[in-house]
Amino acid sequence: MKVRRTLPQRARTLIGAWCFADHYGPDDVAVTGGMDVAPHPHTGLQTVSWLFSGEIEHRDSLGSHELVRPGELNLMTGGYGISHSEVSTARTTILHGVQLWVALPEQHRYAERDFQHHVPEPVRIAGAEVRVFLGSLAGDVSPVATFTPLLGAEIILEPRAAVTLTVEPGFEHGLLVDTGPVRMADTLLRPAELGYADTGNDTLTLTNESDGTARTVLLGGTPFEERIVMWWNFIGRNHGDLVRAREDWQNASDRFGAVEGYDGDRLPAPALPNAVIAPRGNPPRR
């Protein structure tokens, strides 16, 4: 399966509390085999699943069993520890979407396991259709609670449309382009590129530079001032956090629970690098 990691980047670790963005597909599952991710752990983060096409079966150690479909949010909170599996369904022919992570702040990074499913209604504005899965935009507010102020929305722009959105000036924003190209302010973004806008903007103008519709995902949030370490499926504050999480998973600790109903073994953790993984944050703010 074709996967493009757009966050973190060398120049930027986080956008708000968004710390990870994988953009995958579109893939013909008859050729690629689709998605079959065995049970694996998470800690210190929330996962956000958002599909453009296809269908994924989600199971987790909380006991959740849910289908992820286009236009539907699945938000899973790892906190101290959770495990889950992800498998594309037999009905899926084309698999296409984004997998996003949100770093939990220190005060809540050991939050209890949780799973939320939400189907946002599409909002029509001049030149675009908006689906707000987290936060608020275009007059719509997601009911899904987050641990830090966040925005997550799919925006589909009509051909050659220019749309000016009112946004929270205390947020920084990232625009992931799925189809385009799309211009955000003065920056032209091609498909699979992620653009960045700093705090201080109360509007963002998006312009579809193509003759077809353009799909984008707008992410935002207040700057996340904590430094984090991120390795495999874990987020911590220092290397020791990663070592302990890995040991707990390898030892089948109750920390991550067990996923029922998956046909197969769980994923073993890879070996840690020989070097100490140092905490990372964004460049100093000007």
Which ranges hold each PLM region?
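Jelly-roll (double-stranded beta-helix
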Residues: M1-R286
